[in-house]
Amino acid sequence: MHESRLASARLYLCTDARRERGDLAQFAEAALAGGVDIIQLRDKGSPGELRFGPLQARDELAACEILADAAHRYGALFAVNDRADIARAAGADVLHLGQRDLPVNVARQILAPDTLIGRSTHDPDQVAAAAAGDADYFCVGPCWPTPTKPGRAAPGLGLVRVAAELGGDDKPWFAIGGINAQRLPAVLDAGARRIVVVRAITSADDPRAAAEQLRSALTAAN
């Protein structure tokens, strides 16, 4: 079931716990109603972390419960970033791993059998390894510099073109990093058909409308 939902996914949203706003449930509802297919909790470097400190495990699980409930009501997938233990405890559908996180085979020993795993990639060798490897999907970028990953050079749309040539549609992959409605046409022209966004929706005055705009463009391209 998760595999088929992943295969049809086009719009992937990463959000923090929105502790400084206190509106996580309402925000998730709006974003998912707008067409988000996968919603991931990623609080690292967030305004809430800067104001209140790192999200503690108990609070992280509470935020996970909110997102998971909303995702499942909309037939979407709920993802956790980095932490296999939190993903297992929260019953996440997806765990996303960076290049320096657990190897996929180790993470699978911790996770429930049906949990999907994604991997970040930042250069052509990593893209090729992910396309041939045992992760269920991979992300390619950053397409543009982003405050979510401060100090990380952006390989740009050239890496998206590499992924389009290598990956095709054999394994789902998503372009990531600084993507918004204005930049999306260039991302699509480079060959991506799935995207991950953060600020394009999390900073929007109307998250539902922002998601709908992105979703409409992705649907037209597919």
Swiss-Prot record:
Return one Gene Ontology term, BP aspect: thiamine biosynthetic process
List positions binding 2-[(2R,5Z)-2-carboxy-4-methylthiazol-5(2H)-ylidene]ethyl phosphate: T146, P147, T148, G178
Cofactor(s) needed, names only, are: Mg(2+)
Substrates-to-products reaction catalysed: 2-[(2R,5Z)-2-carboxy-4-methylthiazol-5(2H)-ylidene]ethyl phosphate + 4-amino-2-methyl-5-(diphosphooxymethyl)pyrimidine + 2 H(+) = thiamine phosphate + CO2 + diphosphate; 2-(2-carboxy-4-methylthiazol-5-yl)ethyl phosphate + 4-amino-2-methyl-5-(diphosphooxymethyl)pyrimidine + 2 H(+) = thiamine phosphate + CO2 + diphosphate; 4-methyl-5-(2-phosphooxyethyl)-thiazole + 4-amino-2-methyl-5-(diphosphooxymethyl)pyrimidine + H(+) = thiamine phosphate + diphosphate
EC numbers, comma separated: 2.5.1.3
- Provide the residue positions that the database annotates as binding Mg(2+): D82, D101
Entry coiled-coil feature ranges: none
Cofactor mode of binding and number, as noted: Binds 1 Mg(2+) ion per subunit.
What pathway or pathways are given for this protein in its record?
Answer: Cofactor biosynthesis; thiamine diphosphate biosynthesis; thiamine phosphate from 4-amino-2-methyl-5-diphosphomethylpyrimidine and 4-methyl-5-(2-phosphoethyl)-thiazole: step 1/1
- Source superkingdom: Bacteria
- Specify the protein name: Thiamine-phosphate synthase
This chain's source organism reads Mycobacterium tuberculosis (strain ATCC 25618 / H37Rv)
Q: Which gene encodes it?
A: thiE
